[in-house]
Amino acid sequence: MNKDDDKEGLAMFSALIDGIKPITQNKRHFRTPLKTKQEIELKEQQLHANSYFSDTYQPLLPVQGPMRWLEEGVDSLELKRLRRGDYQPDLLLDLHGYRQSEAKLELAALIQACVKQQSLCCCIMHGYGSGILKQQVPMWLVQHPMVKAFHQAPKEWGGDAALLVLIDIGEQPHRR
């Protein structure tokens, strides 16, 4: 086949369908598609992340020594247990390579997953150095109502590059 045959065939086809009107569809009325379950869950996660985690809030966190925080009313022994590694994290979140907005969503999803799975402790790896996530993650965790405490992770769970987080899972008996 060459281009002349194609042009000829196209001209013949155009001559055949000249004057034909498309049939209008008047029998079926289409509804707009409903949102999928995944879209709804994503919107809920974004709403939770935005409502819990403010970038402007500056809590009083230690400048020197290991990063740590304990919610008011929680026994200080819990912080010591986190530091020693008595709590084994059930879930691990690695935030390497995430943008700030993505990290917020992942953090909110991790906390929801901990509550859903009745996981008392989780580990969040934010990375070494003085990057933005290393600074922001503790500030976001302080703002979440389900977080009871966090401490810099022991060496086997990431050391300076990670935090062990203690989650309030409700009135269920604690696991270790």
Curated annotation (Swiss-Prot):
PROSITE patterns: SMR. One of its GO terms (biological process) is rescue of stalled ribosome. InterPro entries: Smr_dom (IPR002625), Smr_dom_sf (IPR036063), SmrB-like (IPR022990). SUPFAM superfamilies: SMR domain-like. Keywords: Endonuclease, Hydrolase, Nuclease, RNA-binding, rRNA-binding. GO terms for molecular function: RNA endonuclease activity; rRNA binding. It comes from the Bacteria. It is an enzyme of class 3 (hydrolase). Residues 93-168 form the Smr domain. Pfam families: Smr. Its EC number is 3.1.-.-. PANTHER family: DNA ENDONUCLEASE SMRA-RELATED, UPF0115 PROTEIN YFCN. Belongs to the SmrB family. HAMAP family: SmrB. Associates with collided ribosomes, but not with correctly translating polysomes. Acts as a ribosome collision sensor. Detects stalled/collided disomes (pairs of ribosomes where the leading ribosome is stalled and a second ribosome has collided with it) and endonucleolytically cleaves mRNA at the 5' boundary of the stalled ribosome. Stalled/collided disomes form a new interface (primarily via the 30S subunits) that binds SmrB. Cleaved mRNA becomes available for tmRNA ligation, leading to ribosomal subunit dissociation and rescue of stalled ribosomes. This is Ribosome rescue factor SmrB. The gene is smrB.
